[in-house]
């Protein structure tokens, strides 16, 4: 009918205009850029003292961009450092995202980090274990002397308070030394004679208690 044609022509145009305006406004809404995540490895001592580290990442334009990251002393394994506004660019005037760098603290030949405690292997000789002794142990930043009690066994742990990793409150965790009794792989003739003599005179048998 004439009325329905008029209605569709008038109100239909209004509806189309509203949809177009809505779409146009939506396109102009600022959208924040996405974050970029990456990770880097640092040593236990680097994390303990803190450092500046450079990393290079490929930017959106395809070029490499270098960032200087300040890693605070005592950072925890798995923590993330945030560089604000260094992520992907936003749209329609939106802010850029952030760059998040996860810190992986890697164990090394000296130490293994577990929480705020440092673990290290303490290798001693059978006679040191039998007689007791004093041995030097490297900790972060210093060397200390550790008393080994007479009769200590392989697998026992000696704990040194305050010589571990930073606890974030001005203190430190423990340094835990895992005792490993080592024998000479190629004993000298004299050592072999002593071992044979010990075998003859000793009544000790660790298997008696099994």
Positions of PLM-derived features:
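Post-J-domain flank of DnaJ/Hsp40 co-chaperones
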Residues: 1-60, 91-95, 199-210
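Glycine-centered tight beta-turn/hairpin loop motif at sheet-sheet or coil-to-beta transitions
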Residues: 35, 60-64, 139-141
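Intrinsically disordered, low-complexity linker/assembly segments
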Residues: 66-210
